[in-house]
Every structure is written in structure tokens, then in C-alpha cells.
């Protein structure tokens, strides 16, 4: 029998531990982000080597408590409260921070979207119609008609834009398992932040507020649905997303085949062997 009284006590203990851990990390951080409500989040902390064992012990405690709390499903604890667990990056030579666009995604069915639109339309009409609300309702009705073209269980992805988050460009030392031939490795800083052990941090940390846009997104090739009900969101049909993913995979595979054929052709040319660019003609 599951002891939910103990589970609730454990959860309260975890929340207190987590809040204090994050508060101390923010207080000593070289960089923090601000959440939409003003809370400091994503602390980036350069950690003296002599403190790594004590911080790792606290991280291990976080991990154990989070895993134990998963045994109490009826408490309905959001996974975002328990995870991710903070991390210590080791074997780092140099770190540069930069900003990138953050996107929150949520999946909804066409039926759910229509329900929320209908609810908002009723609220707007009950408050009285003016020029602004009339245009707003008109936009909602247009989106509703679009959604009615699909089955109620047709799935859509709503991607909310409009805020940024911190990324790291990490250079590891050559003996690190994460070494990337001298090239940097991107690291997404979660809300709980990250620690960077200073033992090998010869070239230090560079705090860069520069904003970098992703070079390519599969969503670039899909026409989004825009609805005033969600002004900072773009809505995409999941089936369209999957189709683009498949096309990207096909294109990538075709490039591999062409590249392999090009290498083979080059090798044969060097050896003085004849090259047949149309294998079917040999049949």
C-alpha cells in the first residue's frame, strides 16, 4: 500500500530543497535569465574544483528524491518540477553564452481548439461588441471554420514564440570524452541551470548577449495557422510536420547515396578505370 502521507511530506521536503539549491546557484551565477514572471532562471555557475564533490552530492540527492516521488502518481506532480536534474560540465576549456529563441510547444486536437475558440467567442459577446472585439471574433470564426475541415481528433502543434533562452558554446579539452576535434559543442541551459567545473577552464567564460537565430527549422517550410486567440503562437498540423520530416530524411539519404557514388567515381578515375554514370546501360 502506497503511503501518500509520506509522499506529500517528501514532496514538500523536495520543493524546499530544490528552491534553496536554485537560490544559492542564482546568487553565485555568472549569468542568469529572467522568466516571464521576473524569476531568475537558468543560472550558469563557474564552480571551483574543490566544491564539485559537495555540489554533486546535492545533485545526487535531487535525483534520488525525484525518482522516489515518481512512485506517487496520484500526487500529480508535474515532471517539470522534478526534472531536469542540474548538471556539472567537466573537462571544459572555454565557454561562451549566447541567446536563442525559446519555443514552448503543446499539442491539441481540432476539437479542443474549436472548444477554446467557442468559449472565447461567448465571453467576448457577453461583454458587448465593439469595433475591436468584432474583428477579433471574426478572426476566431475564420480559424474555427478552418479547424472544422478536419476530424475532431486531428492533432495540431501550437508553438509559442516571443522569449529567449541561454545556450552555451562549449569547448572541451582533448582528453574529454566530449571533445569534438577542437570545435564547440552546443549545450542548452535548462531552467535549473548548469555548473561548469573550473579545473580545466583555461580560457574562461565569455558572457555574450548576442541573439542567434536557428539556421534552419523544418517549420520554415510549413504554412502556419495564425489565430488572434493565441497571439504569440503558430499552429501546425502534426501530419504536415511528419511529412516534412520524412522528406528531409529522404533528401538526406539521397545526398548520402550521391556522395558515396561521387567518392567511388573519384577513386576509379584515379585508378584509370572506366566510369559508367548510367549503370542501366550496361544491362
Swiss-Prot record:
Keywords, in A-Z order: DNA-binding, Repressor, Transcription, Transcription regulation
Nucleotide-binding found in the keyword field: no
Residue span of region Disordered: 254-283
GO MF annotation, one: DNA binding
DNA-binding region as annotated in the record: 30-49
Role played: Sequence-specific DNA-binding protein required for the establishment and maintenance of lysogeny.
Protein name: Repressor protein C1
Amino acid at each position: 500500500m502506497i503511503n501518500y502521507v509520506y509522499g506529500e511530506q517528501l514532496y514538500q521536503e523536495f520543493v524546499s530543497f530544490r528552491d534553496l539549491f536554485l537560490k544559492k546557484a542564482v546568487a553565485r551565477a555568472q549569468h542568469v535569465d529572467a522568466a516571464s514572471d521576473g524569476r531568475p532562471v537558468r543560472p550558469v555557475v563557474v564552480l571551483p574544483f574543490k566544491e564539485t564533490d559537495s555540489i554533486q552530492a546535492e545533485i545526487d540527492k535531487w535525483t534520488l528524491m525525484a525518482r522516489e516521488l515518481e512512485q506517487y502518481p496520484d500526487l500529480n506532480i508535474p515532471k517539470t518540477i522534478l526534472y531536469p536534474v542540474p548538471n556539472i560540465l567537466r573537462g571544459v576549456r572555454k565557454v561562451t553564452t549566447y541567446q536563442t529563441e525559446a519555443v514552448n510547444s503543446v499539442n491539441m486536437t481540432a476539437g479542443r481548439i474549436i472548444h477554446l475558440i467557442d468559449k472565447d467567442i461567448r465571453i467576448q459577446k457577453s461583454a458587448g461588441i465593439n469595433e475591436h472585439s468584432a474583428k477579433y471574433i471574426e478572426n476566431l470564426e475564420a480559424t474555427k471554420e478552418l479547424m472544422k475541415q478536419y476530424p475532431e481528433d486531428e492533432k495540431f502543434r501550437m508553438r509559442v514564440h516571443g522569449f529567449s533562452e541561454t545556450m552555451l558554446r562549449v569547448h572541451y579539452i582533448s582528453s574529454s570524452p566530449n571533445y569534438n576535434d577542437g570545435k564547440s559543442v552546443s549545450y542548452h541551459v535548462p531552467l535549473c541551470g548548469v555548473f561548469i567545473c573550473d579545473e580545466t577552464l583555461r580560457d574562461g567564460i565569455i558572457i555574450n548577449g548576442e541573439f542567434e537565430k536557428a539556421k534552419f527549422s523544418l517549420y520554415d517550410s510549413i504554412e502556419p495557422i495564425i489565430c488572434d486567440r493565441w497571439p504569440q503562437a503558430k499552429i501546425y498540423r502534426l501530419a504536415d510536420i511528419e511529412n516534412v520530416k520524412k522528406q528531409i530524411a529522404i533528401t538526406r539519404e539521397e545526398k548520402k547515396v550521391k556522395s558515396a557514388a561521387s567518392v567511388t567515381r573519384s577513386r576509379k578515375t584515379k585508378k584509370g578505370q572506366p566510369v559508367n554514370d548510367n549503370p542501366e546501360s550496361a544491362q
